[in-house]
Amino acid sequence: MKTTAVIDALGALAHEYRLAIYRLLVEQGPEGLAAGAIGARMGLVPSSLTFHLQALQRAGLVTQVRASRQLIYSADYAVMNELVGYLTDNCCGASGGACDAACGPATRSPKRGRAA
């Protein structure tokens, strides 16, 4: 992933609503979510939602498809994985492996309301 694409992606995610929308879409899975449903969950009016979704699209983090009269948005998992890979690619590279455990995958935090 090119540095400019990483900067664009991180810049797009550097806003409370865009980060929340992106996390919602990642959680939703590849089938995505209709714009109206995203707006309802986020409590955003259509114009604000469009603004934020367009920023995520420009950064390549979100894709849009038309299904009949609805616009369906979904996270682009390939781009997400490239971004994470870029950020962790050289993790502890200069330490001679002394901090390899720190560079491992993050443990998931337990979901609220679900049994552990």
Q: What is the predicted function of each stretch?
A:
Residues 45-46, 50-52:
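Short coil turns linking two alpha-helices in DNA-binding domains
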Residues 17, 32-33, 49, 94, ...:
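Secondary-structure transition/capping residues
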Residues 40, 57-58:
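Alpha-helical residues within the helix-turn-helix
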Residues 4-5, 11-45, 67-79:
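N-terminal helix-turn-helix DNA-binding core of bacterial DNA-binding proteins
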Residues 1-5, 23-27, 77-116:
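Amphipathic alpha-helical dimerization/coiled-coil segments
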Residues 8, 58-59:
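A generic local structural motif
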